[in-house]
Amino acid sequence: SVSSVSAKNVEGFKTGSVMEALGGQVAGVQITQTDGTPGSGFDIKVRGIGTMTGDASPLYIVDGFQVDNINYLANSDIESIEVLKDASSAAIYGARAANGVVMVTTKSGKTGRPVVSYNGSTSYRKISKMLDLLDPYEFVKLQMEVNPSKYAHTYYRTGEDDNGVPYRYQSMNDYIGVQGVDWQSETFRPTWSQDHNLSVMGGNDNTKYTLSFSRYNENGIFNNSGFDKTSGKFRVNQKVTKNVSFDATINYSNTNKKGAGTSGDSGRFNMLAQILSARPTGGLALTNEELLAAAIDPLELESSESLAQVNPIMQTQSVTNTKRSEMWSGNLSVTWEIIKGLTFKTAGTYNTTNTRTNIFYKNGSKEAYRNGQKPYGQTQMGRDLRWTNYNNLTWKQKIKKHSYDVMLGQEISFKSSEYLLGQAKDFPFDNMGNDNLG
């Protein structure tokens, strides 16, 4: 079967990804974001999970050309999206379509005088409802019920300390009504996003063109996180002669993503897990202010090699994780109607993507703590290149009551990936970050 999504349904979503706008609009298609930070990638399952170990991603076709993903496209540049979910996709694209096909058609020029269009928006977002977690009294009560011997004299104690000062909490009831640390409110923040789109299109019977520019920016819900995307496209359709025409497109995309992330380091060190498991009170040892300022919760420190609880606020501030990606692509197709019913088409595409990822862990991060409380960082650079050439000869003819459609095709493609990783540990100080990597 084939499911279609129109431009109107995609443009209405002010997001930095076409995949995010596509979510929930096609029955039987599951789209999940790999991480909670803005600009994170998406996993899409069109026909369920067809493999336990291999890649289950669908085949992406944009304006007739195969691409690795559609992250570079702007929502405002989409004309339509079709998702092929059954065996019909394999009949067209072969084994590559085993996991389904996502076919995208972008906007092209139309006959008429030049039309300049602009649309922009600003959005404000915040968490409408936080999780209802334990307050200090409920938390202390639970700890004493679970392990009273371990937490004896940790949260309350009768009498005075060595300096003759009465203990702040003499009994469990002293915690009733005490305001604790709300880690959710301290870590999460309201966010703003902006989306701007400018396009020019027009043409005549022989030449049609479109030029578009898009800019999207979003702040993350965590401090020191966010995403911005700049994309542009120029497309021209030219009828050279009565029987010859060509279609050329140039695409550009630049994305910048930053943030510590939410799903990395699974288990108890997951960022969201750290927020939900952090103590609302420091007990007798720490005030709320001291608990907020502690990079590592001393009570939850298990040994010199391991730790159970880090400060999620300081984690977002002490981790620098940025990724920059720049993509260029060019597509060209030439169609020649040799005789009536017999058409030859040759098409080529070239795509190159350069990425640079910088990660630096300052003092106060759990990663630096694991490294003997010394900062460390890494830089990774990558380059992906793909080019493809298609050649098709098609014969369509209707003879009496019979219709014939015969196609002879040939394709050659090339893809390469190069990566370079540099890593250093035991930085004497963290002021320079990865600039001191050498």
Question: Could you describe each region identified by the protein language model?
Answer:
Residues 342:
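An active-site-proximal structural segment forming one wall of the substrate-binding cleft
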Residues 110-179, 190, 220-225, 231, ...:
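Surface-exposed loop/interface segments of Gram-negative outer-membrane beta-barrel transport/assembly proteins
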Residues 26, 339, 429:
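Acidic-histidine catalytic/liganding microenvironments
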